[in-house]
Curated annotation (Swiss-Prot):
Membrane topology: Multi-pass membrane protein
Organism field: Saccharomyces cerevisiae (strain ATCC 204508 / S288c) (Baker's yeast)
Keyword terms, alphabetized: Membrane, Transmembrane, Transmembrane helix, Vacuole
Region (Disordered): 1-26
Subcellular location, record wording: Vacuole membrane
Pfam families the record matches: LCCL
Transmembrane segments: 119-139, 245-265, 317-337, 340-360, 371-391, 405-425, 443-463, 475-495, 519-539
A GO CC term assigned to this protein in UniProt: vacuolar membrane
Protein name: Uncharacterized protein YIL067C
KW Transmembrane (keyword) present: yes
InterPro entries with a match to the protein in the record: CRISP-LCCL_domain (IPR051957), LCCL (IPR004043), LCCL_sf (IPR036609)
Length: 678
């Protein structure tokens, strides 16, 4: 009896009859062969598959006997019996669309089979693209702007401003010094200025600024002014704006500069004005801020004639359109890794150099342009690491071997939508997700609710896609870790959790690692948001201090004294420290007080009582402004008074000011300030 193996892996069992044998002498031996089952590799695999299916069936039979809720949870947790993660099907539904979808493979790569030639074509194409890009940004970013008079006289340099910068005003409160001596000239002076695009929203103030007894926030910082059409002096095209108004925001409000492509204008300093009534602005900018009392400085806009302007118009709209157009063929024809990296790098430099630059540059100062490039490269290296992680964790699965039509229709447009965040999502009435900001900004709660509902809907859609692909369990664990980390960071004492654009994109994009249509849509927006956030604000911290959140707003300095008024001496003010406040600050530098009248510092000293009559005697310019305002009014004017603790020798070293108390001059009617600081 024995077992023999043949070359075909068939096993034969031989049974030998002991009574019939064959020996060496030639006798015959009778044997019986029994053919057994063939255990080839293929058959073994099929047997295992059948066993696996039987095990799966037994699991589902057990699941059927469980409670419905338990069955639902286990099915959600374990995923479908047969996971699937298919690319979008719509490109295959119609013949003409299928031809377009197959063109990169069937035609482009067939006609140009050499990978080296395709790569050389790509390099030449990108060089041509960059040359046009440079020709668009050069006249605005690098070439200095001038006004060239027709009479052949010397050309006049044009000053570049940002949307929220001052012209000849230093800042809020007492930044201009006593009687505004550090600012100016406040009259008889003209400037040629250049403003960028998007100043209809870029000229908003996001930190509260006191204007009289009002706190201005979440609106354009233009006080008074408005468009003027005068037959007496047709060169004057606006009413006077208070001189601490943002000039570029005011120019858009007056309609002399476009919010779409910026421009140049002439600013004429007009000196003191008796009041600044609110006016409705152009380009849907709303009403300006009203101020019903005098101020030492103002300016108006004048028409520019008798010459040619150069370098005035902001090309950002053309730059974005160019880069969107030139990036499309690469994304469509070439492998996804080329389209991804080329378009993300180009999108980043589009933001830095044109769409949303992090620094104000002045072409008359080449160092500022070099600084912009330096900042751009500084942020680019860590950004490339983030983009690599995003590619490996999510984008590669979606785009690699994906549908070219889906990439062009779904991923690419939403990518540029995210890049253009400053003209898309930033226009929503949401500044930051803090309790104070949500209360102060009109429409913020409604907008946040809408955004949250949209994100939740997208999350459910994408969670279902992950579940269908059988990876819900894995990503659920990942996002539980993310949420736990955010909760831990938000619990740190003295710090506030801040989810910036790039953080939001980086957290959400791994959950879009599927091949369906939803992944194309969501990934594009999220990658664009990452680029937008880093290009404009760098890798801002995920946790910030209370002082950083104030953004220069009052609330972090020494508390002001309590402002008093004595009816018996109705032209005098006094103040005293709160009993719980220290007499001097910890360093010992703040030893006196600073008094503002109509938002301009008029007194610095150690006295705790000040007479308005004495201030008028010591400051003839103040007395003249008050008298002129009285003559132009109905016999009374409002004086807005605020006081703070300050250093006598260096008044800019100060604490917070009180809110404004209102003294009606000259009859002495007093309205005490509201609680709080300014």
């Amino acid at each position: 009896m024995g077992v023999h193996f043949d070359d075909n892996a068939n096993t034969t069992w031989e049974a030998t009859d002991p009574g019939v044998s064959s020996d060496c002498d030639g006798q015959h031996r009778v044997t019986e062969s029994i053919q057994l089952q063939n255990f080839s590799n293929t058959d073994m695999e099929s047997m295992l598959d059948e066993e696996g299916r039987e095990n799966s069936k037994s699991k589902w039979l057990l699941l059927k006997r469980k409670h419905p809720i338990q069955k639902f949870i286990e099915r959600v947790w374990n995923g479908p019996v047969e996971p699937s993660d298919e690319p979008p099907s719509f490109p295959k539904r119609w013949g003409w669309l299928k031809k377009i979808d197959d063109f990169p493979q069937t035609t482009f790569k067939t006609k140009i089979p050499s990978k080296l030639i395709r790569l050389l074509l790509l390099i030449v194409y990108c060089c041509f693209w960059m040359r046009i890009f440079y020709s668009l940004i050069y006249p605005y970013l690098i070439k200095p702007p001038y006004f060239h008079p027709n009479d052949g006289s010397e050309k006049i340099p044009i000053l570049s401003l940002s949307c929220n910068s001052y012209l000849n005003w230093e800042g809020t409160n007492n930044e201009c010094g006593l009687n505004a001596k550090n600012c100016g000239p406040l009259d008889n002076k003209e400037y040629m200025i250049r403003c960028p695009a998007l100043c209809d929203r870029g000229g908003w103030t996001y930190s509260a600024i006191a204007v009289g007894n009002r706190r201005v926030k979440y609106t354009g910082y233009e006080i008074g002014g408005g468009a003027l059409f005068s037959e007496e002096d047709p060169m004057v095209v606006s009413y006077p704006y208070r001189s601490d108004s943002f000039p570029c925001a005011s120019a858009v409000h007056a309609g002399v500069i476009s919010p779409f492509y910026g421009g140049c204008t002439k600013v004429s300093m007009q000196g003191a004005q008796n009041s600044f009534p609110s006016k409705k602005g152009m380009y849907n900018t709303g009403f300006s801020v009203a101020f019903n009392s005098f101020f030492p400085g103002s300016y108006s806009f004048r028409d520019i004639q008798g010459g040619i302007l150069s370098g005035c118009y902001d090309p950002r709209a053309a730059v974005v359109a160019l880069n969107m157009l030139f990036g499309l063929p690469i994304f469509y024809l070439y492998d996804s890794i080329y389209g991804y990296w080329i378009n993300t790098i180009v999108g980043y430099w589009t933001l830095v150099l044109s769409l949303d630059p992090p620094l104000l540059t002045d072409a008359h100062d080449p160092a500022s342009v070099y600084e912009l490039f330096s900042v751009g490269f500084q942020r680019l290296l860590p950004l490339c690491f983030v983009l690599y992680v995003v590619w490996k964790s999510a984008v590669k699965r979606t785009l690699e071997n994906g549908s070219p039509i889906a990439k062009v229709i779904l991923w690419y447009p939403t990518f540029w939508l995210g890049i253009s965040n400053n003209v898309t999502f930033d226009r929503l009435p949401v500044d930051r997700l803090t309790t104070t900001d949500l209360k102060e900004q009109a429409g913020a709660l409604t907008a946040v609710g809408s955004i949250a509902a949209t994100i939740l809907t997208c999350a459910v859609i994408q969670a279902y896609s992950l579940w269908k692909s059988g990876r819900f369990k894995k990503y659920f664990k990942i996002y539980i870790c993310f949420i736990g980390g955010l909760i831990a960071l938000g619990s740190l004492p003295g710090l506030n959790l801040r989810i910036h654009h790039y953080i939001l994109g980086s957290i959400l994009v791994p959950g879009c690692a599927t091949r369906g249509s939803s992944a194309y849509l969501f990934q594009g927006i999220l990658v664009g948001l990452i680029l937008s956030g880093v290009a404009r604000w760098d890798f801002a911290s995920i946790v910030e201090t209370d002082t950083a959140l104030l953004r220069g707003e009052a609330g972090a300095s020494l508390k002001p004294p309590i402002l008093d008024f004595n009816d018996d001496q109705n032209h005098s003010l006094s103040w005293h420290l709160n009993a719980t406040d220290p007499v001097i600050d910890q360093i010992g530098n703040i030893d006196g007080f600073s008094l503002l009248l109509n938002d301009v510092e008029v007194y610095v000293g150690k006295n705790e009582t000040v007479s308005i009559d004495v201030l008028r005697m010591e400051n003839p310019a103040l007395a003249q402004m008050m008298d002129d305002a009285l003559d132009a009014s109905n016999g009374t004017i409002d004086l807005y008074l605020r006081v703070a603790r300050a250093s006598v020798r260096s008044p800019t070293n100060r604490g917070d000011y009180t809110n404004a108390g209102v003294l009606q001059w000259p009859n002495g009617m007093w309205q005490k300030p509201e609680p709080g600081v300014s």
